[in-house]
Structure formats: structure tokens, C-alpha cells
Amino acid sequence: MKFLALLCLGMVGFAFGAEVSGLDMIKSYSIAGAVIGLGIAALGGAIGMGHAAAATISGTARNPGISGKLLGTMFIALALIEAQVIYTLVLALIALYANPFLS
């Protein structure tokens, strides 16, 4: 965890090396926020997908007769989990390319 925090601070630290304007500071914070937010969303999505797959496999092992229903429900759950990550990606791209604070 310390390594991850040090890595994130090192990525943001280059912006403070020289005199920068307010716009450059907003850009650097936007990049850092987008990277951190997308990383957290991807990590949470991966954990959620793993739990969904494990629960489906466990349910199929207990009752093989309903494996078709469980599989369909799992695919819907995986699509909803992945949609959350895609929404975070869209917000990160908006923060990077259409930032309202830069206009």
C-alpha cells in the first residue's frame, strides 16, 4: 500500500517542480483524478465480477439443473458491473478533454 501511495504521489509530483499556471495545475489534477478514479473503478469491477462468477459456479455445483438461469443472470450482472467501469471511463475522458474548468 505504501508503494502504491508513493507511486501516485510520484506521478503527480512532477507538476510541482516548476512554476506553473493555474490551468496547468488543473490539467495535472484532472489527469491524476482520472487515473486514480479509473483504477479504483476497474479494481472494484474486477472484484465484483470475480464474486459474481464464484457465486454462479457455486450455485451450478449445488444444483446443475438451473445452470442456464444462473448463467443468464450472471451475464446480466457482469454487464451491469462493466457498465459502471465504462461510466467512470467516460467521466475520466470528459475530465481530460472537455474540462469545464479550463474554458
UniProtKB/Swiss-Prot annotation:
The keyword Transmembrane helix is annotated on this UniProt entry: yes
Annotated compartments: Cell inner membrane
Gene Ontology terms: cellular component: plasma membrane; proton-transporting ATP synthase complex; proton-transporting two-sector ATPase complex, proton-transporting domain
Family matches, as CDD domains: ATP-synt_Fo_c (cd18121)
Membrane-traversing stretches: 3-23, 30-50, 74-94
Positions of the record's site feature: Reversibly protonated during proton transport: E82
Record-linked Pfam families: ATP-synt_C
Keywords annotated in UniProt: ATP synthesis, Cell inner membrane, Cell membrane, CF(0), Hydrogen ion transport, Ion transport, Lipid-binding, Membrane, Transmembrane, Transmembrane helix, Transport
InterPro entries given in the database record: ATP_synth_csu_bac/chlpt, ATP_synth_F0_csu, ATP_synth_F0_csu_DDCD_BS, ATP_synth_F0_csu_sf, ATPase_proteolipid_c-like_dom, F/V-ATP_Csub_sf
SUPFAM superfamilies: F1F0 ATP synthase subunit C
Superkingdom of origin: Bacteria
Membrane topology field: Multi-pass membrane protein
Single GO MF descriptor: proton-transporting ATP synthase activity, rotational mechanism
NCBIfam families associated with the record: ATP_synt_c, PRK08482.1
Function: F(1)F(0) ATP synthase produces ATP from ADP in the presence of a proton or sodium gradient. F-type ATPases consist of two structural domains, F(1) containing the extramembraneous catalytic core and F(0) containing the membrane proton channel, linked together by a central stalk and a peripheral stalk. During catalysis, ATP synthesis in the catalytic domain of F(1) is coupled via a rotary mechanism of the central stalk subunits to proton translocation.
Subunit structure: F-type ATPases have 2 components, F(1) - the catalytic core - and F(0) - the membrane proton channel. F(1) has five subunits: alpha(3), beta(3), gamma(1), delta(1), epsilon(1). F(0) has three main subunits: a(1), b(2) and c(10-14). The alpha and beta chains form an alternating ring which encloses part of the gamma chain. F(1) is attached to F(0) by a central stalk formed by the gamma and epsilon chains, while a peripheral stalk is formed by the delta and b chains.
Matching HAMAP family: ATP_synth_c_bact
Family: Belongs to the ATPase C chain family.
Listed name of the protein: ATP synthase subunit c
Source organism: Helicobacter hepaticus (strain ATCC 51449 / 3B1)
UniProt gene name: atpE
